[in-house]
């Protein structure tokens, strides 16, 4: 069957945000930017997806552990929900708050 599926950047950003909300140690997601073609045909994958995520983390957590987990889980959730692969998921920790 021929056809095309287009997935909006808002969908990718929502999947990323929902995933991040489930990770312990992340205080809040400040900004998510996506770029690339969010397009897939039934017969071949033509996406070129890049995601930039800006986070605030809580003290007492290892930043490398949290961010690596976030990258893996976001990639997995995007792949399972949309069939798309991200070329890059860049995470920037731009603030830290005391754990409450």
Regions found by a protein language model. Give the residues of each.
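Short beta-strands and strand-coil junctions in structured, solvent-facing domains, enriched
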Residues: 3, 60-63, 81, 98-100
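Short edge beta-strands and adjacent turn/loop segments
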Residues: 23-56, 93-95
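A short interface-forming secondary-structure element
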Residues: 51-68
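Short, non-transmembrane amphipathic alpha-helical segments
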Residues: 63-82
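Generic non-transmembrane alpha-helical segments
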Residues: 15, 19-23, 73, 77
């Amino acid at each position: 069957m021929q056809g095309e599926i287009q997935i909006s950047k808002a969908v990718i950003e929502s999947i990323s945000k929902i995933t991040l909300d489930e990770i312990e140690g992340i205080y809040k997601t400040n900004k998510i930017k996506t770029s690339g073609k969010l397009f897939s045909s039934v017969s071949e994958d033509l996406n070129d997806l890049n995601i930039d995520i800006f986070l605030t983390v809580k003290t007492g957590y290892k930043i490398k552990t949290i961010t690596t987990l976030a990258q893996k889980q976001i990639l997995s959730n995007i792949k399972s929900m949309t069939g798309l692969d991200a070329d890059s998921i860049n995470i920037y920790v731009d603030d830290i708050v005391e754990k409450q």
